[in-house]
Amino acid sequence: LDPTNVGVLKVFAGITPVSAGGDSIGGTIIAQSRAPEFAPAGQSITKGELGAFYRGNNQARGANVSVMYATDAFNISYSGSTSKADNYTAGADFKTYDFTGRAGHNLPRNEVGSTAYDTRNQTIGLAFKSDNHLFQAKLGFQDMPFQLYPNQRMDMLDNTQRSVNLRYAGQFDWGSLDARAYQEKVDHFMDFGADKRYWYGMGSMVAGSSVASQPCAPISSTCAAGMPMLTEGKTSGVSVKGDVTLGQHDVLRVGGEMQQY
């Protein structure tokens, strides 16, 4: 979920309610996208938003756009964003060396390696409202060419995510009902990025160096081309929950969820 699309952010510290997951350790953070907006009866509204940012330290830059058209019963929207940054730099040198472990690839002593990233997000949404009933459908696409991690041995060098979300929300005399169905497909690739050693084994070591590596061949017990990890995942699920009003101060909350990985 892109930050510009966040509508509500809830934080549960410590014990988490079952309705919010219930299986968290230490707490739960729930991020909800913006609720669809509808026009007054007999009217229509059109909205748009443009945004951009730039930060000098790591040349971080990004932009976002959103457009929306709605009547009193229909809403269609699109949002897109992009964000990219290079490695960031510290206030002064914090290393006594320039090498990264890869022959010929050095970093300035004040540069924090493996902190760069590049990501793009797009979402299309449809919503229909009839009295106290709401139907929503969302298509999402995320393309992340790389996300480097300074505190991990591996980096994410490609990630593509496609998602479909359907939702029904209704208000009744007895309470409320919320039902969802969703599917997410992810193509994920991790390996060592440019700021980490990429080739392993005796056959890859630079002569006279104990820290630098170089390309080697053929791949064998003495030559390893990094540690590529390709993952293809699909998650599908449905959830239903209802709040039954028992009295002025009492609510019975029931629900169920089924998920397949």
Regions picked out by a protein language model, each given a short descriptive name:
Residues 70-73, 127-132, 170-174, 243-248:
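Outer-membrane beta-barrel strand-turn architecture
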Residues 8, 13, 28, 47-51, ...:
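Membrane-embedded beta-strand positions in outer-membrane beta-barrel channels/transporters
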Residues 90-112, 191-228:
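Solvent-exposed loop segments that connect transmembrane elements
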Residues 3-49:
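A beta-strand signature from Gram-negative outer-membrane beta-barrel systems
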Residues 211-261:
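Outer-membrane beta-barrel transmembrane domain signature of Gram-negative proteins
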Residues 30, 37-38, 45-159:
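Periplasmic-side early beta-strands and strand-to-turn transitions of outer-membrane beta-barrels
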